[in-house]
Amino acid sequence: MIGVTIKARLRTSGISGSEEMSISKTEGIVLKHTNLGEADRILTILTRNNGKIKAIAKGCRKPKSSLLSSSEVFVFSEFVVYKGANFYHVSQASTRETFYNIRKDLLRLSYATYFAELAESVSDEDIPSERLFLLLAKVLYYLSTGEIPMGLLHVGYQLKLMDISGYRPNLAKCAICGKSSEDFIKFSVNLGGVICGDCSTDERLWKDGDVFKISHGTIEVFKFLLNTEISRLNTKKIDNTIFNEIDKITRSFILSHLDKRFKSLDFLDDIKDSGF
């Protein structure tokens, strides 16, 4: 059964035969890897049950290794791992989905790299986040199949990831006075939400940080993207002007609240600008 944790005595090189180790069986997606020695890798894995972990996959770069496929970036596998002093160690792995089509297209690959970097940025080691894991798995699936436009997946994923991380944009009440209104005309990134017409007249209340004009239609699409399952994102036709507004606001929202510059996002921008 996925995610079942058992206690067992594990005999392996460097571990005492009498040392009790915790063995976990869990689904996971490789976010990134670093080569180690001649044939090993350190994997950063977003798991379903254990949160983000760093695990050593011994010999995984050898052509005949049983861990070869499961140690590649973006691959979804079932892992059996045990926890050592500094790292987890991969004992077994069974590949569930490689999302192979992502690797055949540079633009898809660029999106996936950014999605993985975002997930790594907001996840914590050994703190489970099944919602984040399932979100990433679904997004990689639809990115691979091409059933949902990449740009739509991009915006939808970012908003849902921020929601899971505790940064859901406030679209229902004025971020300054707290009143509900149909007259929201600005979105403040620093304040994390919309600003009503009355409060928008006093620039001193919201002048810090990025502030965007926002229409009622844009707010409604924001709500749709936040509240709709990834699999149904393409059920609503979105005006290009509104989509571009949301894309700009979402980007600023993420960079501000996560306080990080993502190299993979810069690379994605370069790929899109090149017309690839």
Sequence positions of predicted segments:
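Non-catalytic alpha-helical scaffolds and adjoining flexible linkers that form interface surfaces
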Residues: V4-I6, S13-F276
